[in-house]
Curated annotation (Swiss-Prot):
Highest taxon, organism lineage: Bacteria
Source organism of this protein record: Phenylobacterium zucineum (strain HLK1)
Keywords annotated in UniProt: Cytoplasm, DNA-binding, Repeat, Transcription, Transcription regulation
Family to which this protein belongs: Belongs to the MraZ family.
The protein's name: Transcriptional regulator MraZ
HAMAP family hit by this protein: MraZ
Any single Pfam family the record assigns to this protein: MraZ
Length: 160
């Protein structure tokens, strides 16, 4: 699993060192990663062949000509870049992706299980704060639902 958060600096050629743990997880038919504009946030999404296969599987399940299939093909497959690791474990981010997300200096690489994201550092800090608040609220709601379900279940057991 891609885990943890790392801050890395882009060099003048838009190269970043990919954390060793991430390089090992991305191992597959080629020595590198697949990257594309995320469809859920303003960042680059990346991963190994398993992530590519997962998105491709979702796309293949949709009928040819389905508007969602076309949107996913354009957004994911059309925006995807196959980025190979150099001998120092770096990838060179495409200029188009750097321009799209304002990646010019420091970036944040965030592990999300089966994938990772590359963010402009300040944009990620704002995103992380919003996600923490959403997680807090969601967890509180989930706990309330679980308590209500336990109470309802225990109430049904004693009514009979």
């Amino acid at each position: 699993m891609f885990l943890s958060t790392f801050e890395k600096q882009l060099d003048a050629k838009r190269r970043i060192v990919v954390p060793q743990e991430f390089r090992a997880l991305a191992a597959g038919p080629f020595d590198g990663v697949f990257c594309f504009p995320s469809i859920e946030a303003d960042c680059i999404e990346g991963g190994g062949k398993a992530l590519f296969d997962r998105y491709n599987g979702v796309i293949e399940e949709l009928e040819f000509g389905d508007p969602l299939r076309s949107a996913l093909e354009t957004s994911v497959l059309g925006g995807m870049a196959k980025l190979s690791f150099d001998t120092a474990g770096r990838i060179t981010l495409p200029e188009s992706l750097c321009d799209l997300f304002g990646l010019t200096d420091w970036v944040t690489i965030v592990g999300l299980g089966d994938r990772f994201q590359i963010w402009e550092r300040e944009a990620f800090n704002a995103h992380r704060a919003a996600q923490r608040e959403l997680a807090r609220q969601g967890l509180a709601e989930l706990r309330a639902q679980q308590r209500a379900a336990r109470l309802a279940h225990s109430g049904q057991g004693s009514a009979g």
